[in-house]
Amino acid sequence: MRQVSEFLRQAVEPKRLYTVVKEVSSYHRIQASTGFRKAANYCKETLDQLGIESRIISYKASPDVWYLQNKMFMEWDLKNAWLKLNDYDVMLCDAQTEPISIIQKSYPVDFTSGVELVYLSKGNNPEEYKDIDLKGKVIFVRDAFNGYVNWAVKEKGAIGIVTDFMRTVPGIRTRNDLYESMNYTSFWWTHEEDEPKTFGFVLSPKMGDWLAEQCTKQMKAYERKEKDTPYLKVSGKVDSRLYPGEIEVVEAVLPGETEEAVLISAHLCHPKCSCNDNASGVSASIEVLRSLKSLMDAGKLARNKRTIKVILMPEFTGTYAYLSESEHLKNVMGAINLDMVGGKQTRFYGPITGTSLPNSTPSFINDLTSLCMDYAAEEAPNLSGKMVSKTNYTFEFFSGGSDHVVFSDPTVGIPCCMLGQWPDLNYHTATDTLDVIDPEVLAFSCRTAALFVYTLANLNENHIREIQNKAHVNLSKRLAETAQHVLDGKLKAEQISHQLRHIKQYFTQSAEDYKRVYDIEDALIEKEKQWISTAVDQMMNYLDVEETELKVQDDRVFERTYVGPVNSLVDCVTRYPQSKHLYETYQQKMKTMGMGAHTLEALMQFYLDGKRTVSEIAQCIQCDTLMECHDVVSAFVELLESMRLSVQK
């Protein structure tokens, strides 16, 4: 593996990576849009020029279509959009200059004759505005706009929304950190009959503060009877269309000798610019294929035995569509997802982070991914000649947020780690621009992915021994973390044995996973399992752990009736309106879970295998996350059952 890594260090071209990021980021790549289609065509043309076999697969984009557990939506085409403050003759938004200045998927509207702008200065509380007439007016709000759609637009008749909301992230960014940027916002329409057809515009915090000041001045002047109206006037237009259309998935292939395949995924979507998120992942994926092909063509590397595939798709949406065709589920041995992999590691930009598999999907793919990161990190010699990393990187426990979640669902069965980057100061904003990209960091991510797919495509016993050695390191780390949790008081005494058994089971099953992809001798697997058992038993003795039995509070066993995780429970509830009260109960319980809620929802589905009781599922998740969640799990399985997504055994 080290020799292959060295070849890749020479073959991967940072300048080429940077150029592709630049080109991809020039397209406004909203899911199911003409701009996304143009970006997909660019990627296809680039692959063609490199002599790499590729195709574009199209799928229907219409609200009556479901792919696995993901409901589709209309295609959106934006020609132009602008918003002007008439009283000051100031252009507030211009989508041709900055496409993020419109709330994506806005419906068409023409109010060039002017309408009143109502500043809702008291936040999202309908009671504060019960005496204010919003009919036919545009509202100006300072917080997340979504909560205003139902009451201000649907009930009180506002026609549109202006917002200067900037998502803050504790410890990473405040509103003032991105004072002149704009938040990436979008409507995610369900296209139900009673859904309002509205539009919206986005301001920077700086422009929003100025507009709020002018609105307040106008109101005070009106109260002093110096103005005829309490409201300023705005005019504007949104020239857009929503209609049944298509989404595209770009698939590229380095053919192998067998029908088995390994996969790289990277989402191609997001607004114009959006360089780290995720033009970086797209660029790295293309460069993986180019660099491997060039090395194989030059005779430096042997041809890949398994087929190597890349898919570039709309995030989640394209993955569900792609996997809905069973041919894409067959014979995929493993995958790696690239999402935000090239940001300059300066202020508020974190390490390149490998996100591990969930423990519900045990596989050696975890250890292979982290080992590939180590090899890619051999970038430059230190003063004693040892190769060390110029790139900050880490490997962390499973969390959600990107397409690896779909692949790693046990019902899909494609073990997939992710390379990402967090923190990212400019995440989902207008300032995720080309200047945040570091070609050398991006090259590190590219080399990691290239080594991963090439090794898995040609896996042999020598590789397995290297990966097993890395598994020993990773197991030792997990055991040390458990000991630290005990010291920190994060694990109760009765929980420690459950935690260690959980770790032992995961690593044991991961050791057995080699049989899935290689005809390995049983003796080598048994030796590895014995090493794992001994290591865990030693930690049990070190911590003076007494075996404890699980206290079963709920012995019900449920089995899923669907493939792939549910993408939106809201969409599922629209199919089963009688489940709304159970959904609301579940949501109330989930609020107590904080930032881990998204990951928790995935894990609950992954452990729902028709064998574990509700209490056992809650115990597994507590071992994974240290979150006590029994009540949440109970509420969740009852909600799924009411929507016929699970059955009690």
Annotate each language-model stretch with its function.
Residues 570-602:
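Short alpha-helical segments that sit at the start of domains
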Residues 596-649:
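Long, charge-rich, low-complexity alpha-helical segments
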Residues 5, 11-12, 90, 186-193, ...:
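Metal-dependent peptidase/peptidase-like ectodomains
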